Amino acid sequence: MVKVIVLLPRRGDMSPEAFGQYLRETHLPLVTKLPGLRRLVVNWVLPDPNGSPPAYDAVSEDWFDDAAAMGAALASPEGQAVAADVPNYLDLSRFALLVVEEEDVPLPTGSAASPAG
């Protein structure tokens, strides 16, 4: 399984509210049509504890069976529609896309998040 992590900075002329609305109502419906997409998660970035604005507004995680499935999805007509929409809401000078393989790291027994904890 491969995951595409996308760092999503909104365009400077968009408010956070307009960005969220555009992402939810326009862009994500395009992403959900990607062939071979297994899972889609959007993480909304919270303000920094010191009050400074976050560098990114959201981070998306898109899961595919493998790199070939991801490549096929991005090359498909649906993938081309997703790519064509990106400049409508993202600051392309700060946008980043990472292709990763996830590895679960077991926590020590007794830790707060471990099953036996």
Where are these regions (language model features)?
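Macromolecular interaction modules
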Residues: 1-117
